[in-house]
Amino acid sequence: MNGLHLIQYLKEASYPVTGTPLVAFLGDSVTHGAFECLQGAGENCNFDFDAVYHAVLARELRRINNWLPVSILNAGVGGDSAKGPLARIDRDVIARRPDLCVVNFALNDVNDPLEVYRASLGEVFDRLAAAGIPVILLTPNMMNTYVHPDTIPMYRAYAAVTADYQNSGRMDAYVDAARALAAERDIPVADTYRRWKSLAAAG
């Protein structure tokens, strides 16, 4: 799904013709807007809310179709996994009545058992569906494939772990599980992960 597909999706959504569609983005630090974290998360992270992907998307949508303004609801939380929204989805998303919710989890979920991810993401999808909110699954970016020599010492051990998650196929398994859950529910998929894999394979 690209920008033009999203515009068509929004045009067909059930919001007033004179209104402005609200698109919620539910996810982790990538959705929140964190670009680097020097120690832990939260205040120690560098956030750029103008460069976060959904802000870039909003600008692109305006460029493609400037007569259909789109409002963005950032419901990303740094460090979150798919089980995190189960405690906050009513307040952070459903109560705001978005016309569409884009869901993006997996990067932190690889630290949990795969079945926990499946169950949690499935419940997120089902609760949004029960509230009448259409969903798009956005698959995540790849993890690192090696530990760069300039990696900050305190992060080297975890960088080795995430490189193993990526190279061993663990990350692939979680993304495949998300795709399967979406397919079972006829949820459209914006497959960023597939693009990353293609780029990595091309060098």
Regions found by a protein language model. Name each.
Residues 76-78, 141:
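Short, solvent-exposed turn/loop segments enriched in Gly/Ser/Thr/Pro and often Arg
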